[in-house]
Amino acid sequence: MTEMPKKKFSPRSARGDKPRYGEQKPKLKRSGDKPRFNDDQPQGFKEKSDRFQDKPRPRTNDDKPRRAGDKPSNFKSRFKDKDRDKPRYGDDRPRRSGQKPPFGKTFPAAPPPMDSEQAQEALDLLYGHHAVLAALDGDRQLNRIWITSHLRHDIRYRTKIQTAKANGTVVDEVDNFRLNQITHNANHQGIAAQVAPYHYWELGDLIDKAKSQSTAPVLIIIDSITDPHNLGAIIRTAEAFGAQGMVLPQRRVAGITSTVMKVAAGALEHFPVARVVNLSRALETLKESGFWIYGTVAGKQTALHQADLREPMGLVIGSEGEGLSLLTQKHCDHLITIPLAGKTPSLNASVAAAISLYEIFRQRGFDRPTLSHTASDLREVSED
């Protein structure tokens, strides 16, 4: 028997006979086939396109001559020949209220609005029933009165307004809105008045008037009080207790302003105030005229209730912070103090003046002030 020849087997590759994904067996080229794109390049290599290479950029349009109506091609050339500092047409015209200034320009800030006290100082303004009625009853000249329609025919004002108008005072009938503008929203109660500046007394005339009114007159002397509210409160208290007048130095002390008049609530129309250049010289003049000078200080001095206060006297009141100056203390005959039992070291100037005035007039003949209502009247009010 003839033996068949043995078949020879080639060794099998480790990865198998099938090609992996993406691998293809080389195809036989047929007649007429064109080479595929990049068949002649090694696998994984791609030639860089020349379109991404740097090439000389063409000239910009700005180098070309422009035609009428063409706009600049970029932002920088837009302001190339423009003068930014040159004022534009219309910048010199006044602006309307509330209109914003143009961008990049600054204007001086508007002055801050005045508060009610500054407005009063600028106009010598009085407002409210007590202050205006006292001014109408007094000797001071009123330049102008602003009053609402319902108050003008009020029985309290009708005759007085007519008299003031006959004396040359301008009377304007306004509404509350206008009064709010004039007084800067203060509590005007429907009336305001512009008064002439206060006319100070001469010291000699004040002394003569005080002596003619009392055998033991009391004058208030102010030292270093710059707060107009304190000064107005002292004037009101002194006039209410029966003092004959006040002496003010020209410097380092608040003057008689509209704020002082408002706080005094009409007391200045019946309370003379003298103004002196030199306070020390004025104290010596008072001494020569028979007045004893008492200065109020804090410390271990004679207690207020232990001093004899029944003679003609001048009571010197200093500020809460500074007190009486050393020079003023040297010209005082006596230094008195208000005894305090608490932790507070001192009192407000107007409070100290009120306590001192009460003790002065208590020693002179009254034990307590007269009340405007009796106990029976108060009982009827409480029952209602």
Swiss-Prot record:
Region Disordered: start-end pairs: 1-116
The UniProt entry's GO CC annotations, sorted and at most eight, read: cytosol
Cysteines paired by S-S bonds: none
Enzyme class label: transferase
Bias-annotated ranges (Basic and acidic residues): 14-70, 78-95
- Write out the residues that bind S-adenosyl-L-methionine: 318, 338, 347
* SUPFAM superfamilies tied to this protein: alpha/beta knot, L30e-like
Q: Quick check: keyword RNA-binding in the entry?
A: no
**UniProt key word Zinc:** no
Transmembrane residue ranges: none
Q: Name one GO biological process term.
A: methylation
Q: Which molecular function terms from Gene Ontology are attached?
A: RNA binding; RNA methyltransferase activity
User: Which CDD domains is this protein grouped with?
Assistant: SpoU-like_RlmB
Task: Name the Enzyme Commission number(s) assigned to this protein.
Answer: 2.1.1.-
| Keywords of this entry | Methyltransferase, Transferase
Residues in coiled coil: none
Q: Which InterPro entries match?
A: Alpha/beta_knot_MTases, Ribosomal_eL30-like_sf, rRNA_MeTrfase_TrmH, SpoU_MeTrfase, SpoU_subst-bd, tRNA_m1G_MTases_N
The cross-references to NCBIfam families, in alphabetical order and at most eight, read: rRNA_methyl_3
- Stated family: Belongs to the class IV-like SAM-binding methyltransferase superfamily. RNA methyltransferase TrmH family.
Protein name (record): Uncharacterized tRNA/rRNA methyltransferase slr0955
